[in-house]
């Protein structure tokens, strides 16, 4: 959530920055609400001053033995008007809060301006895509060859956009997740967490998925109890660990990592990536979250991105890093880098990680703060998140980049310890 004071006092400036994201701020309505708020607040303050004066006059009139009934009537009337003023202020604030929940974050000044993914800027590349001397198969053909990837049975069980993995491919999928978690905890300083896969609405509001993106979520209604939602990413549960807290500055940065399934309805993805494991309703992901001092958050974003890149480097998978433009960033991000891995069957790079600095946007929603050691006052932390990595898409990249002419798959060196020393599957 944006700073309400900033939106109220500088709506034109905020609108101009949001316009670079393709978001149209209703400036007229915000200015009208601000005028109403000022008017009601001024009147309320005047009434309170008058009521205080009347109350003081009642005591003085009593001492003089005068009739205080008119003064009491004034005090009662003003009390009713003050209650009405409070109701009006609450209604104005409620409408503003509702508007704020639907407004995306402001892009950082370093973010390239553009309308869509075509304006994203390539920052760097690592590795060279392999040249094959045989016809490249996609991961579906490679996995179905021995029945180790079974989309037909998955569809029978659950419908479209699900996968059933068996045998060596299931083991390879598990090996990837274990490798990622071990790397991030042992070398990158993250604390591993096991989180709930079901969360309540306030957690999703805290990280920005609600109320705007409810159609993307799987919701579980419960009679007489709060609804639960399947997490679309462990970002939700990890970031909300600090919800409502005031942290000691010495605790920062906090760095969490978790391997979880993720659940998404893919409501806006009809017709896209219908074949294979690229876009599914259920997929595993290793998620990294950092809670940091605001002064260090953009430096932390570079480090977070490097942590995700390290996974791809050790797997020797070619990739590139993109700085997302204003029009392609996620709702809560102020700056984002996407990592795209080379997928030979598609002859292009595909997203495998998104690393974002959300500034104080999520922290304000969650009321996650730290105590500034210089002022002693609570201030909002900054939050960051990134995939380290999406396990299913990493599996796709390994299957396709490590395929051999006979359809077998070489096991990447860093995964061999997790595969019992197996060097080739298939």
Swiss-Prot record:
Keywords for the protein's UniProt record, in alphabetical order: Aminoacyl-tRNA synthetase, ATP-binding, Cytoplasm, Ligase, Nucleotide-binding, Protein biosynthesis
GO MF terms held by the record: ATP binding; serine-tRNA ligase activity
Protein name per UniProt: Serine--tRNA ligase
Cellular component, GO, one term: cytoplasm
Coiled coil spans: none
Catalytic activity annotation: tRNA(Ser) + L-serine + ATP = L-seryl-tRNA(Ser) + AMP + diphosphate + H(+); tRNA(Sec) + L-serine + ATP = L-seryl-tRNA(Sec) + AMP + diphosphate + H(+)
GO BP, sorted A to Z: selenocysteine biosynthetic process; seryl-tRNA aminoacylation
Gene name in the database record: serS
């Amino acid at each position: 959530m944006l700073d309400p004071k900033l939106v109220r006092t500088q709506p034109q400036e905020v609108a101009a920055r949001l316009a670079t994201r393709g978001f149209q701020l209703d400036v007229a309505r915000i200015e009208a609400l601000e005028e109403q708020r000022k008017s009601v607040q001024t009147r309320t303050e005047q009434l309170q001053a008058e009521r205080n004066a009347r109350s003081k006059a009642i005591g003085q009139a009593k001492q003089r033995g005068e009739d205080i009934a008119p003064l009491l009537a004034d005090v009662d009337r003003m009390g009713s008007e003050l209650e009405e003023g409070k109701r009006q202020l609450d209604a104005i604030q409620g409408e503003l809060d509702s508007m704020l929940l639907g407004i995306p974050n402001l892009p950082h000044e370093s973010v390239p301006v553009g309308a869509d993914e075509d304006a994203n800027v390539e920052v760097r590349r690592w590795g060279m895509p392999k040249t094959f001397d045989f016809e490249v198969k996609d991961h579906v053909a490679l996995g179905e060859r021995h029945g180790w990837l079974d989309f037909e049975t998955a569809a029978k069980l659950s419908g479209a956009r699900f996968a059933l993995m068996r045998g060596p491919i299931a083991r390879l999928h598990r090996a990837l997740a274990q490798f990622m978690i071990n790397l991030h905890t042992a070398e990158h300083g993250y604390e591993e967490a096991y989180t709930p896969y079901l969360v309540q609405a306030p957690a999703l509001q805290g990280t920005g998925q609600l109320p705007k993106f409810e159609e993307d979520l799987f919701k579980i209604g419960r009679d007489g109890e709060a609804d639960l939602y399947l997490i679309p990413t462990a970002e939700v549960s990890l970031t909300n660990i600090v919800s409502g807290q005031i942290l000691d500055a010495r605790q920062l940065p906090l760095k969490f990592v978790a391997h979880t399934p993720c659940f998404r309805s893919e409501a806006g993805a009809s017709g896209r990536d219908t074949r294979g494991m690229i876009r599914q309703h259920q997929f595993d992901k290793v998620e990294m979250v950092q809670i940091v001092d605001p002064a260090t958050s953009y430096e932390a974003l570079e480090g977070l991105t490097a942590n995700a890149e390290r996974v791809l480097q050790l797997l020797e998978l070619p990739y590139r890093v993109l700085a997302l433009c204003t029009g392609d960033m996620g709702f809560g991000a102020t700056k984002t880098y996407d990592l795209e891995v080379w997928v030979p069957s598609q002859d292009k790079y595909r997203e495998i990680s998104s690393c974002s600095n959300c500034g104080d946007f999520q922290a304000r929603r969650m009321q996650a703060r730290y105590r500034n050691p210089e002022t002693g006052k609570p201030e909002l932390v900054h939050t960051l998140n990134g995939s380290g990595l999406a396990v299913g898409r990493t599996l796709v990249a390994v299957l396709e980049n490590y395929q051999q002419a006979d359809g077998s798959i070489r096991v990447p060196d860093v995964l061999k310890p997790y595969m019992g020393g197996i060097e080739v599957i298939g």
